[in-house]
Regions:
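Active-site loop-to-helix "anion-binding N-cap" substructures in soluble metabolic enzymes
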Residues: 1-176
Length: 176
């Protein structure tokens, strides 16, 4: 989940906490020979391309954190993304442009989900904050590819499970 807070004037990332949280899964995949295609939404562009909501600054920050190039696709399922995905080698990572620049993402458009899935061999869900959403990049893609939980999702589920299975008393749960 790279939906990170940004400075409204400059577009500069003001907290990279969510990017850092994704690093264990990304590093695990890269170190084990995967070619990684990362994707995320940023903000609510409602299907329109908006420069302030591009994921280019996220690709730059992710590159700094990983200490390696993060290839950035200037589209989502267009020619740039497809060509870069096809050329991706094991141990390389690419980030697609903001998924919500395409209106079909939030509508769980089957054709959009299918096009996303055609660039990959499997799907790793590592955005705990979005797993409940029936969007093309989550529920839709999982219809076409073998799907797995990433390390962050696994960690969140483990923490929740422990809290619910054997909570310290007194115990109050507020879920939203």
């Amino acid at each position: 989940d790279f939906n990170v807070p940004q400075n409204k004037e400059t577009g500069e990332i003001t907290s990279d906490k969510r990017i850092v949280a994704a690093l264990p899964t990304i590093k695990y995949l890269l170190e084990n020979g995967a070619a990684v295609i990362a994707c995320s939404h940023l903000g609510k562009p409602k299907g329109e391309w908006k420069e302030k909501l591009t994921l280019a600054p996220v690709a730059k920050r992710l590159s700094e954190l990983l200490g390696m190039e993060v290839i950035f696709a200037k589209d989502i399922i267009g020619e740039d993304a497809k060509a870069k995905a096809a050329a991706l080698k094991p141990g390389q990572i690419m980030l697609l442009e903001n998924l919500r620049f395409d209106i079909r993402e939030e509508k769980n458009g089957d054709d959009f989900a299918k096009a996303l899935s055609e660039m990959a061999d499997l799907y790793v869900s590592d955005a705990f904050g979005t797993v409940h959403r029936a969007h093309a990049s989550t529920a839709g893609v999982a219809k076409y590819l073998p799907a797995y939980a990433g390390l962050l999702v696994e960690k969140e589920l483990s923490v929740m499970g422990k809290a619910l299975d054997n909570p310290a008393r007194p115990f109050v749960a507020v879920l939203g």
